[in-house]
Amino acid sequence: MRKFLVVLYTAFLIGANAAAADVAALREGDMKKLALHETPVPVPEVVLLNAQDGEHSLADYRGKWVVLNFWATWCAPCRREMPSLDRLQAALPDIAVVPVATGRNAVPGIERFYAEAEVQLLPVLRDPKSELARGMGVMGLPVTVILNPEGQEVGRLIGDAEWDSDSAKAILTALAAGQ
């Protein structure tokens, strides 16, 4: 029985690594910066605030794949990246694109940023004390993290990217399909 379990576990690992390799092979352009984890990483539970100071958390998105983006209104690369995140949300509505303004970002500034960038589909969420960012080891901005439906980190991209690129959409679609 033990030998059977070892063989079964080994086959599972080979299959899991092959699936990860298939997804990794889809990385082109900016997506080459995407680091995929071999083992999912737990994410801390932290209260996030919306524009009206209502409380939310990443648990609100359990059961869905999440593209979690850490950004700030003063961040120039974030300004370039945000419209592509909005277009990604339009292209892949079954995946939650969740931008979190980390640090001191006033709601009027966020709303002005969204208006200037023509962001229409993304929620306004804030991490005013940078608790989530610190808990996840975010040192600079922007940082985008991919969460599986269990709320665990499975990938991370440091810096800005074109999230509505064919490569990004192919990677996210493959992950969501269970590859």
Place the predicted regions along the sequence by residue.
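N-proximal helix/coil linker or "cap" segments that precede and/or mark the start of modular domains
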Residues: 19-45
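Short, ordered coil/turn segments that flank beta-strands lining enzyme active or ligand-binding pockets
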Residues: 51-52, 149
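Positively charged n-region of N-terminal signal peptides that target proteins for export
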Residues: 1-4
